[in-house]
C-alpha cells in the first residue's frame, strides 16, 4: 500500500506519543475509524478537526491544512490487497458480496448502499474461544432512479 508522506508523519507522531485512534476520538469528537480514514487520506477533516489532530500529535500547525483537502479516495494500491487483514475484507466481499447484494435488494429493492452517507464502527467482542472483531457498516440506501 502506497502511503502518502503526510500519513507517514502523522503515524510516526502517533506512535511516538503513544496515542491510539480511540484517544484521538475523545480529543476530536469524531469516531476513531473516521479519524483513521483522515490520517490515511481517505477522508477530509474540517479545519477545526484537522487542527485538533495535529495538535494532539504535537505536529506543526501547517500539517492541518492538507487534511482538509478532499483526497483521492479508494486509491490504495495494489488493486488486490496483500496485507492479510485488508485482504480478509476483499475475501469477504468475494465470498459474501453477491449474497449480501441479493438480500439488500430483497429488503430494499434495486439500489445501492451509500459509502458517502455512511459510518463504520469496529468493536472488540470478548469470547471464551478467542476475542472477535465486530465490524458494523451503516449506509443510506439509495434506490436507482427510473426515467
Curated annotation (Swiss-Prot):
The cross-references to SMART domains, in alphabetical order and at most eight, read:
Cyanate_lyase
* Keywords, sorted A to Z: Lyase
Q: Which GO terms describe its biological process?
A: cyanate metabolic process
Under the GO molecular function aspect, what terms does this record hold? cyanate hydratase activity; DNA binding
Known catalytic reactions:
cyanate + hydrogencarbonate + 3 H(+) = NH4(+) + 2 CO2
Q: What is its EC number?
A: 4.2.1.104
Q: What class of enzyme is it?
A: lyase
Q: Where is the active site?
A: 88, 91, 114
Quote any Pfam family the record assigns: CYNS_N
Give the function comment from the record.
Catalyzes the reaction of cyanate with bicarbonate to produce ammonia and carbon dioxide.
* UniProt family annotation: Belongs to the cyanase family.
> Protein name, please?
Cyanate hydratase
Q: What is the source species?
A: Acaryochloris marina (strain MBIC 11017)
Q: What is the lineage of its organism?
A: Bacteria, Bacillati, Cyanobacteriota, Cyanophyceae, Acaryochloridales
Question: Which gene does this sequence derive from?
Answer: cynS
Amino acid at each position: 500500500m502506497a502511503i502518502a508522506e503526510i500519513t507517514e508523519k502523522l503515524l510516526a507522531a502517533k506512535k511516538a506519543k503513544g496515542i491510539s485512534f480511540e484517544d484521538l476520538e475523545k480529543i476530536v469528537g469524531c469516531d476513531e475509524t473516521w479519524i483513521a480514514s483522515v490520517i490515511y487520506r481517505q477522508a477530509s477533516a474540517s479545519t477545526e478537526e484537522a487542527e485538533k489532530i495535529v495538535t494532539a500529535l504535537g505536529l506543526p500547525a501547517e500539517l492541518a491544512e492538507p487534511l482538509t483537502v478532499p483526497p483521492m479516495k479508494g486509491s490504495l494500491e495494489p488493486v488486490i490487497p496483500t496485507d492479510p487483514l485488508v485482504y480478509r475484507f476483499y475475501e469477504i466481499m468475494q465470498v459474501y458480496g453477491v449474497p449480501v447484494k441479493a438480500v439488500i435488494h430483497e429488503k430494499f429493492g434495486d439500489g445501492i448502499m451509500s459509502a458517502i452517507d455512511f459510518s463504520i464502527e469496529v468493536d472488540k467482542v470478548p469470547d471464551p474461544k478467542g476475542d472477535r472483531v465486530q465490524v458494523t457498516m451503516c449506509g443510506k440506501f439509495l434506490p436507482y432512479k427510473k426515467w
